[in-house]
Every structure is written in structure tokens, then in C-alpha cells.
From Swiss-Prot:
InterPro entries: Anticodon_Met (IPR041872), Met-tRNA_ligase_1 (IPR023458), Met-tRNA_synth (IPR014758), Methionyl/Leucyl_tRNA_Synth (IPR015413), MetRS_core (IPR033911), MetRS_Zn (IPR029038), Rossmann-like_a/b/a_fold (IPR014729), tRNAsynth_Ia_anticodon-bd (IPR009080). Zn(2+) binds at C144, C147, C157, C160. The gene is metG. This is Methionine--tRNA ligase. It comes from Chlamydia felis (strain Fe/C-56) (Chlamydophila felis). Its main location: cytoplasm. It catalyses: tRNA(Met) + L-methionine + ATP = L-methionyl-tRNA(Met) + AMP + diphosphate. The keyword Metal-binding applies. A motif ('HIGH' region) lies at residues 12-22.
Length: 551
């Protein structure tokens, strides 16, 4: 029976272009997993959207001389275009200015307040006497209280990933004027996170998290304290009973997963469809995020869900990446350590980029993109192993007139059957890797299967068999090689969708109805009918070069 699967990626801030680090961290892994679950035949909904409130946006919009809505509209389109170019197979890309979001945020707030989990408190906050206003989050910078980095933001350190209040910074100053800030009393609404420690620990104990994430978040939850969920800004969702205050972006943003699903349901003219994913406990919910978003997704948002009465689906698995670097340093457009996505894709194929990002994904530790590694992986793995196996077999078949290959039990020898069994074993291993969210191991399985195919072809040497007049034996070897290629395309599809589709198109297997499949959302192939070798027929087409060498 198919499972219902809800997949979300962290909502990207609508305040700048996406870089390779973002893609390798939260978006390519989610896309790969969504494609894998569709192949299994599951009912998948992959949701994301722009995060359009918060101080980072007001700060950059003011610097750009643009209105806030104009600014987020611009980056919403840029992000959507980027995801389209990268073939991130989102079912819907929403935004936190969608028509459902405001009312939903207000409902969360009202429910949490009615249960005594939100209360107004007076506290000391950072104030700029020069600018005559309170400043917080990214309007503030200073020295990180954890690692000592000077230039840390007011809500998190971009160097070590620490999460804190702006008042925790050492020597805080205004991001705009550079002036020293003072502490001044003001009133804000506070979420009593410390009252949610036990429910959160119980929830985390039942959820799937990578061990490095689990260790961090358990310690984090044990030290929770009340947290302000309001800000003194003009851009944001107004707090219903608190004049001149808006909600803190990390209170409203995660609710965007739910409102974004409502937005999707409206777009498909089935306004109640969102409930199948958010109000059904049987739904499997997997979140993909970056390292710096762990506290908000593993503690604050679950606390918001647990603290109110509507049984919204809580995440079953939280997949968090570490940092992805460029040549050993953080991606930074202002510092020149940056790759223009459009220019890169004008030079190199999309699947080459997807493969290298997957093979070097920062799954359990920081990793990096380097041009030397990109070139090496493309040429030695995609061209030397993968592409070579496909092209040599299909080119030989066409040159020697083998247009249709049909399974014949009598023509298969023990070594052929062992080869097919070994191929099936690797496919099963790939399934396990995808199921456990490991792109790196999936890439290894892809190359292992390609290498197995090359070894088989080398050992059987169909060119020699042909010279010896053993055409029936050549046909058996080519059939087995093509069957392996069909499986190779299957396990490659989540990472290399364009390449996999080309392979299937050249093989034209009887077991795959290409006409009735959407090549961007191939569904229900990972099943016994597709694997059944006894009924398979290949109607080969003229081969096309799959992978070109990177100079």
C-alpha cells in the first residue's frame, strides 16, 4: 500500500540568491528523496516557499532602495527560477505572504497564549540612541559569545552556527550606523519554551535525527528559556493584541509549511487536500534543513505544534546538513567567494552539477566544492565509468545490427545470471542508501553498478564472440548489459534525472511506458514488474553521447 509522504525544505530567505551551499544542504537532498519516494509509488507532496519577513529582508531592502514587498517579490521569482533550472521537483513553491499565512500564524499565537505559554514581559533590549529605535537580529552585530567571531549577527553566528539573543552579543553595535548600542526597557511577547522541555525531549526521542543533530538538540532543549516572539518592525505579521509589534520571523516562518500546503491545495482546486498531509497521523513527514536551522525546526516549531490543540503532523525525520564550503571558505558574494549559478549552468550540464553536489554532500561533516574535484569526478566517474558503460554497449549494438534484444533463458549462462544477481544486489543497496537519506552512498552505489557493468562487458568481450560466429551469445551478453543499464538508470534517476531518462529512451524497455510518464516526476517503477527480467524486451535507438569530458 502506498505511503503518504510530506517533504519540506527550509524556506529560503527572500533576501539574496541561492548558492551551491544552500542547494547541497536543504534542496537537492529533499528533491532526491522526493524522486526516490515517487519511484516507490508513494503519494508524495514536496513543499517549499519563500520566507518573506524578518529583519534581514528589511535591512537589505532598505539598502537596495526598494519597498519591502517589491524586494521579496523579486527574490521569490529568482528563487523559483533557480529551483526550476536545477530541476528541484517541488510540487508547490509558496511564500509567507500567501493568503492563508497571516490567519494561521494568529491562530497559533492565540492558542498558545490561551494555554499560558505566551506572556508579555518587560525586558532590556538593544537600543540605538543615534537612530532612536530598538534594534535586534540582523540589525545588530558584535562578538559571538561562543566562538569570539567579531561580526556575528544579532540572532546567530554565521561562523560557528551559535543561536542566541542579540543581548548576548559582546560589544553590540548597529549594522546600519556602526554606533554602540545601549540596553533599554521594552515590552515583548515571550514564548515559555522552558515549559515544553519534557514534551520536546519525548518527541525527539521518537523521531529520526542524525546522531550529531540529536546530541546537539537534546542539550539545546534542556537549556531552553523564554524567548521573545515579537519585534519592533513595520514589516511582518502584526501581533493581534500588541500595537506596533510584529511576529519574530522564526515564529511565523515554520508555519509557512502548513500555509504553503493550504496554498497548494487551493491551486489544485481542492482546498481541503492539505488536511490529508497535516491532519493525518499516518502521513510520513520528512524535513530537510541546513545546520543553522536546527534549533528552530527541532525545538521551537515542534514546541509550537505541541503547545496548541490542533493535531498538526509533527516531523518524523529531520535531515540536517553541515556547512558546504567553496574551496575551503564560506560562500560569500561580497567577499568574491561565489559561483554564479546561471553562468555555471551555461558552461556545464545540470546533471554534472547535481552529481558532484550529491557525491560531496555535507551529510555528517563540513565538505566543500572545488573545481579540481568537480573536473575529476566528472571525467573519471561520470565519463570514465558511467558514460563509458552506456555508450560502448549501445554503440556496439547499433554498429553490428542488434536492434531488438529479447530475454531467453536458454541463452543465459551461469556467469550471466550471477551478473544479473549482483546488479540486483547493488540496486537493493542503493534503495537502502536513499531510504536512509545518504546521497553520498547512493552515488557510490551508482558507480559500483556502472563498474560492474564494465567488468562484465570486458570479461564477456562480445566483439570477440562476434568474430567467432557466436551471435546468439553476443545477444545474450548485450541483453544482460542493457538490463543492467535499465537498473542503473533507475538508481541514478533521483540524482541524474535527465541522464536516466536519456538512457531509458535509448533502451526503450518494454517494462517502461515512457509515453505515460512525466520525465520530471517518474512514478511507481521500483517494483517487481520493472525488475522482471523474463518478460523484458529492448528496442534500441541510436545512442547519444551522455557525458562529455570537462576540460
Amino acid at each position: 500500500m502506498p505511503s503518504r509522504v510530506l517533504i519540506t525544505s527550509a524556506l529560503p530567505y527572500a533576501n539574496g540568491p541561492l548558492h551551491f551551499g544552500h542547494i547541497a544542504g536543504a534542496y537537492l537532498p529533499a528533491d532526491v528523496y522526493a524522486r526516490f519516494r515517487r519511484l516507490l509509488g508513494d503519494d508524495v507532496l514536496y513543499i517549499c516557499g519563500s520566507d518573506e519577513y524578518g529583519i534581514a529582508i528589511t535591512l537589505n531592502a532598505e539598502r537596495a532602495g526598494l519597498g519591502y514587498q517589491e524586494y521579496v517579490n523579486m527574490y521569490h521569482k529568482i528563487h523559483k527560477d533557480t529551483f526550476d533550472k536545477l530541476k528541484i521537483s517541488l510540487d508547490f513553491f509558496s511564500r509567507t505572504t500567501n493568503p492563508f499565512h497571516k490567519a494561521l500564524v494568529e491562530d497559533f499565537y492565540t492558542q498558545l497564549k490561551s494555554k499560558g505559554l505566551i506572556e508579555n514581559q518587560t525586558s532590556l533590549q538593544l537600543y540605538s540612541e543615534e537612530e532612536n529605535r530598538f534594534l535586534a537580529d540582523r540589525y545588530v552585530e558584535g562578538t559571538c559569545p561562543r566562538c569570539g567571531f567579531d561580526g556575528a549577527r544579532g540572532d546567530e553566528c554565521q561562523k560557528c552556527g551559535a543561536d542566541y539573543e542579540a543581548t548576548d552579543l559582546i560589544h553590540p553595535r548597529s549594522k546600519l550606523s556602526g554606533s554602540e548600542l545601549v540596553l533599554k526597557e521594552t515590552e515583548h511577547a515571550y514564548f515559555h519554551l522552558e515549559r515544553m522541555v519534557e514534551p520536546l525531549l519525548d518527541f525527539i526521542d521518537k523521531s529520526y535525527l542524525p546522531e550529531h543533530v540529536r546530541k546537539f538538540i537534546v542539550d539545546y532543549i534542556k537549556n531552553l528559556r523564554p524567548r521573545a516572539i515579537t519585534r519592533d518592525l513595520s514589516w511582518g505579521i502584526p501581533v493581534p493584541d500588541f500595537p506596533n509589534k510584529v511576529f519574530y520571523v522564526w515564529f511565523d516562518a515554520p508555519i509557512g509549511y502548513i500555509s504553503g500546503t493550504m496554498d497548494w491545495a487551493a491551486s489544485v482546486n481542492n482546498p481541503e487536500a492539505w488536511k490529508d498531509f497535516w491532519l493525518e497521523e499516518s502521513t510520513e513527514y520528512v524535513q530537510f534543513i541546513g545546520k543553522d536551522n536546527i534549533p528552530f525546526h527541532a525545538a521551537i516549531f515542534p514546541a509550537m505544534e505541541l503547545g496548541q490543540s490542533i493535531p498538526y503532523k509533527k516531523m518524523d525525520a529531520l535531515i540536517s546538513s553541515e556547512f558546504y564550503l567553496l574551496e575551503g571558505a564560506q560562500f560569500s558574494k561580497s567577499e568574491g567567494n561565489y559561483i554564479d549559478m546561471d553562468a555555471f549552468l551555461d558552461t556545464y550540464s545540470l546533471d554534472k552539477l547535481r552529481y558532484v553536489l550529491a557525491a560531496t554532500a555535507p551529510e555528517t561533516s563540513d565538505s566543500e566544492f572545488t573545481f579540481l574535484d568537480f573536473k575529476t569526478r566528472c571525467n573519471s566517474e561520470l565519463v570514465g565509468k558511467f558514460g563509458n558503460f552506456i555508450n560502448r554497449v549501445l554503440a556496439f549494438a547499433e554498429k553490428n545490427g542488434f536492434k531488438e534484444l529479447v530475454y531467453s533463458e536458454t541463452l543465459l549462462e551461469d556467469k550471466d545470471k550471477k551478473f544479473l544477481d549482483d546488479a540486483q544486489r547493488i540496486v537493493q543497496e542503493a534503495r537502502e542508501h536513499y531510504s536512509k537519506y545518504s546521497l553520498r552512498k547512493a552515488c557510490s552505489a551508482i558507480m559500483e553498478l556502472a563498474a560492474l557493468g564494465n567488468i562484465y562487458v570486458n570479461d564477456q568481450a562480445p566483439w570477440k564472440l562476434l568474430k567467432e560466429g557466436l551471435a546468439h551469445r553476443v545477444e545474450a551478453v548485450l541483453f544482460c548489459a542493457c538490463y543492467c543499464q535499465k537498473l542503473l538508470a533507475l538508481i541514478s534517476y533521483p540524482i541524474l534525472p535527465g541522464t536516466a531518462w536519456e538512457i531509458w529512451n535509448m533502451l526503450s524497455p518494454k517494462s517502461l511506458d515512457l509515453v505515460n510518464q512525466d520525465k520530471d516526476r517518474v512514478k511507481n517503477l521500483w517494483n517487481s514488474e520493472f525488475f522482471d527480467v523474463s518478460d523484458e524486451v529492448f528496442s534500441l535507438k541510436t545512442p547519444q553521447l551522455l557525458c562529455a569530458i570537462v576540460d
